[in-house]
């Protein structure tokens, strides 16, 4: 009956728009495109094309079925007629209307009408090739179809429950997938269904998502499970907004890392033991991973401790000096450590000399940034920024910009060179402006071979200069480093935030009162009977510069 047909069309599987919800879906898609938003639609092809679909008549005729019979057009891997109709009659018209790529959500097993062929792998293959038409870089979103699926990015890890256990698993899952060459996982950030409402859990999930291959907020169809930041308490909303904006700023860094992955097979997220296979500690931190060439991330997946108002992440610091890009704390490895952070922070550590390109453009465009900022950390390093035209011929139409960073600690002198871009510089937006922020420098004498202005960014020295087709050379002397709180002040601040009876806190603090140096404070800490969570917090404060 007509009524039952409408009911089926409103169900889970189908290829026709619900016109009660989208009265003019073409205008809706056009509006999204005008907002610089890309569109993907969720597919469940297992039931084929049924008689109540808008395009059924055309599909049925194409495969030799009389539409009057209302016979289902069954999904088939071996029928050329089916594949041609599937793309030409079902998907391509919607692509002309504004759909950019497809989310392939096959969940009906690995058997098809071709023995040994997983239908999801076949769908991935054909959709990926089809999406490359007209010069586009091909993209799909899909469930995992087994080994070899890494050829068809990107991945969808499935419907997850909303709880801390699932969040705790995902950083390990994401980094560990590098062992199967599956680098581009995406998760339902915030969780998909079931579980419980927890604003803290939501924000921690977003923080992890910012430092994962793909950030994709999603939930099941439930009015009470929306993942929009404004549906959470105000402090969480403001922090989520900050993190989502920062993720967009990372577009230049992540794009460069994804190009390196394409060329060299180096994953954006990789386990610590990839670089340190002989270090036992590198195998004992499953939730810590390299995020590109410059950063290490250790997402916090545990609940906030009510005594410290902080949550923790287990981490291992490799040999060398690593600086938290947000708190500027310096960690000297190798060492095992428990990292403590407030709800609004995630531990992300930069290697010595790290160079991190960030977009300074307003809005949500995915184009190469017109305003580009470089975060510079003290040390010796080089970094090559990659940009292209976003088309399949990108190997011919790309530009690379090399940045050299040298730091002479003894003379307190920094030299930074932004080399002249090489390649197809037409992909670089005209009128580009650079902002170079030395994250650990408060002030310095600046020498530059171009006109420039000096500004301060969160107390750090920033230099602004126009793009140049020649080398830009910056030299800093008489450097004044940003001063961190002294160690006694750190002890006082940490113990002040301790949620405990004043008399008890005062008694524990008494032995620290007469200690002045870091060594004296650490000695008191070692013999103190403080609760473990407070000792961990104080230890981190005392061993970092």
Task: State each model region's role.
Residues 47, 146, 278-280, 303, ...:
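Residues that cap or initiate secondary-structure elements
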Residues 31-35, 291, 307, 366-368, ...:
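Solvent-exposed loop and beta-edge segments used for protein-protein assembly and interaction
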Residues 1-345, 350-351, 530, 534-545:
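Catalytic-domain carbohydrate-binding cleft regions of carbohydrate-active enzymes
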Residues 455-473:
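A surface-exposed beta-strand-loop module
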Residues 352-450, 477-545:
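Accessory, solvent-exposed terminal regions and/or long lumenal/extracellular loops of proteins
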Residues 323, 329-332, 444-453:
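Surface-exposed loop/edge segments in extracytoplasmic proteins
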Residues 153-155, 290, 296-298, 338-340, ...:
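Ordered hydrophobic segments in well-structured contexts
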Residues 295-296, 412-416, 461:
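Hydrophobic residues embedded in beta-strands of well-ordered beta-sheets
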């Amino acid at each position: 009956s007509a009524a039952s047909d409408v009911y089926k069309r409103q169900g889970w599987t189908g290829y026709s728009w619900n016109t009660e919800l989208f009265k003019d879906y073409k205008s809706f898609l056009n509006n999204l495109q005008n907002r610089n938003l890309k569109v993907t639609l969720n597919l469940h092809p297992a039931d084929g094309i049924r008689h109540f679909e808008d395009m059924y008549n055309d599909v049925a005729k194409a495969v030799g079925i009389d539409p009057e019979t209302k016979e289902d057009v069954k999904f088939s891997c071996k029928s050329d007629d089916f594949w041609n109709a599937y793309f030409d009659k079902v998907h391509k018209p919607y692509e002309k209307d504004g759909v950019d790529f497809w989310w392939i959500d096959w969940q009906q097993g690995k058997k098809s009408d071709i023995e040994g062929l997983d239908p999801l792998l076949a769908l991935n293959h054909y959709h990926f090739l089809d999406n490359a038409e007209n010069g586009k870089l091909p993209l799909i979103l899909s469930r995992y179809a087994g080994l070899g699926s890494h050829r068809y990015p990107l991945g969808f890890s499935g419907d997850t429950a909303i709880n801390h256990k699932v969040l705790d698993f995902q950083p390990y899952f994401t980094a560990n997938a590098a062992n199967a060459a599956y680098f581009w996982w995406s998760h339902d950030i915030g969780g998909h269904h079931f579980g419980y409402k927890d604003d803290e859990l939501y924000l921690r999930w977003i923080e992890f998502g910012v430092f994962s291959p793909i950030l994709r907020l999603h939930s099941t169809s439930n009015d009470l499970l929306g993942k929009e930041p404004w549906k959470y308490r105000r402090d969480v909303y403001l922090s989520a907004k900050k993190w989502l904006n920062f993720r967009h700023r990372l577009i230049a860094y992540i794009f460069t890392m994804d190009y390196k992955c394409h060329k060299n097979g180096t994953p954006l997220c990789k386990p610590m033991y990839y670089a340190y296979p002989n270090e036992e500690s590198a195998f004992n931190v499953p939730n810590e991973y390299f995020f590109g060439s410059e950063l290490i991330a250790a997402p916090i997946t545990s609940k906030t401790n009510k005594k410290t108002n902080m949550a923790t992440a287990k981490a291992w610091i490799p040999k060398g000096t690593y600086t938290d890009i947000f708190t500027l704390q310096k960690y000297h490895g190798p060492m095992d450590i428990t990292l403590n952070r407030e709800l609004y922070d995630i531990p992300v550590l930069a290697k010595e000399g790290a160079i991190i390109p960030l977009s300074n453009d307003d809005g949500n465009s995915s184009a190469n940034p017109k305003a580009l900022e470089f975060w510079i950390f003290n040390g010796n390093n080089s970094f090559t920024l990659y940009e292209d035209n976003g088309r399949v011929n990108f190997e011919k139409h790309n530009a690379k910009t090399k940045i050299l960073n040298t730091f002479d600690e003894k003379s307190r002198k920094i030299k930074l060179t932004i080399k002249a871009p090489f390649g197809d510089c037409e992909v670089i937006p005209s009128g580009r402006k650079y902002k170079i922020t030395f994250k650990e420098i408060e002030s310095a004498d600046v020498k530059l071979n171009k006109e420039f202005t000096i500004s301060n960014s969160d107390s750090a020295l920033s230099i602004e200069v126009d793009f140049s087709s020649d080398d830009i050379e910056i030299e800093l002397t008489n450097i004044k480093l940003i001063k961190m709180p002294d160690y006694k002040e750190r002890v006082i601040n940490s113990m002040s935030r301790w949620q405990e009876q004043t008399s008890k806190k005062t008694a524990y603090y008494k032995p620290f009162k007469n200690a002045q140096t870091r060594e004296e404070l650490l000695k008191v800490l070692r013999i103190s009977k403080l609760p473990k969570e407070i000792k961990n917090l104080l230890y981190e404060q005392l061993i970092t510069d």
